Regions:
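N-terminal Rossmann-like NAD(P)+-binding domain of SDR-like oxidoreductases, especially those catalyzing
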Residues: 1-174
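Short regulatory "switch" loops immediately downstream of catalytic or recognition motifs
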Residues: 55-60, 173-176, 236-246
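Short-chain dehydrogenase/reductase
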Residues: 90, 138-146, 180-188, 192, ...
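C-terminal substrate-binding subdomain of Rossmann-fold SDR/epimerase-dehydratase oxidoreductases
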Residues: 193, 199-326
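Short capping/connector residues at structural and topological boundaries
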Residues: 84, 125-126, 134, 140, ...
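Glycine-rich, flexible loop/turn motifs
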Residues: 37, 79, 125, 131, ...
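Mobile, glycine-enriched helix-loop/loop "lid" segments at the mouths of ligand-binding/catalytic clefts
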Residues: 175-176, 180-206
Length: 326
């Protein structure tokens, strides 16, 4: 089977491409390379351009009319940057995605898997969020993801599309075969900063916030190996129709599924696990929370297990080891 992956030259998109290939499928990549890496497209079908370039999208589908479903990963994803540069985030993540979704439905390619985020959840007392948990996106980045979920849901209702929004928790690690991994020069995510600190590119690792209402005062997250995350996308794409059947075939043609491990790890616990894998302590200190930070959450993973027939299997230590190796 053949699938379109927007943002397929990025960290998560490229890992999804590898997982598809390993399962015997063919990814077609559409990526602007503004943040993606051209080497992640090597030996793959690749279209260099923008998701809002209607002529390019039309040409892509005319040359690959057998595309079964689309995974929409293309987006800007840095929370603090979204606070300081909201225009770019709403332009890229919302305006262009609306155009892209409309082009998909106009061309008759109506199966969409959308890369959403757990960042749009409100904090709940026990930190475990189901897909029905209250929504409270507090950063422009999180709001763009929520807006696009609503757009996709409305398009499914109005135009007969079918959409699956996968709400990611905190991806870590790299492709276990080292075909791709995190590639930003200055990482903003916690594990990238730990690696940079361990390898001397960063002087000290800052634990942002130690007065959150968690068991040790540091933020709580659900760290999921990016390879597990990619496998969930393969399930969503290849078994697209069956996923809807398992979900009871909702009339609006739209599903939301959390992708996480189902267990919470605090930032301090992650640091301790990192030091154990790395074999020595790193320089660290507590610092105030960043703009847009929240105490955090972890996934209720029941729906993913029931509808996707998927669960996370790789331990946090492997995610750390793969990140260090990468």
């Amino acid at each position: 089977m053949k699938f379109l992956i927007t943002g397929g030259a990025g960290y998560i998109g490229s890992t999804i491409c590898s997982a598809l290939e390993d399962a015997g499928h063919t990814p077609v990549i559409l990526d602007s390379l503004i943040t993606g890496r051209v080497e992640f497209t090597r030996n793959r079908i690749f279209y260099h351009g923008d998701i809002a370039d209607t002529a390019l999208v039309e040409r892509l589908f005319s040359e690959h009319p057998d595309i079964y479903a689309t995974v929409h990963c293309a987006a800007l994803i840095v929370v603090p940057e979204s606070v300081s540069s909201p225009y770019e985030y709403y332009q890229d993540n919302v305006s262009k995605s609306v155009e892209f979704f409309y082009t998909l439905q106009r061309l008759g390619y109506k199966r969409v898997v959308f890369s959403s985020s757990a960042a749009l959840y409100d904090v709940v007392p026990d930190f475990m969020v189901t897909e029905e948990a209250p929504i409270k996106p507090i950063s422009p980045y999180a709001r763009t993801k929520f807006m696009m979920e609503m757009v996709l849901k409305d398009f499914c209702s109005a135009y007969g599309m079918k959409g699956i929004a996968l709400r990611y928790f905190n991806p870590i690690g790299a492709d276990p075969q080292m075909r791709s991994g995190i590639h930003v020069p200055v990482p903003t995510h916690v594990l990238g900063k730990l690696v940079d600190t361990a390898q001397g590119r960063q002087a000290v690792f800052e634990i942002t916030g130690n007065e959150w209402p968690t068991r040790d005062g540091t933020g709580i997250r659900d760290y999921i190996h990016v390879w597990d995350l990619a496998q969930a996308h393969v399930k969503a794409m290849v078994d697209f129709g069956q996923v809807f059947e398992r979900a009871g075939s909702p009339a609006d043609g739209y599903l939301v599924i959390n992708l996480g491990t189902g267990s919470g790890v605090t930032v301090l616990e992650l640091v301790q696990a990192f030091e154990k894998v790395y074999g020595q302590e790193i320089n660290k200190r507590f610092a105030p929370p960043r703009p847009g930070d929240v105490a955090g959450s972890f996934a209720s993973a029941d729906r993913a297990r029931e509808w996707l027939h998927w669960k996370a299997e790789l331990p946090i230590e492997l995610g750390i080891a793969d990140a260090l190796k990468w």
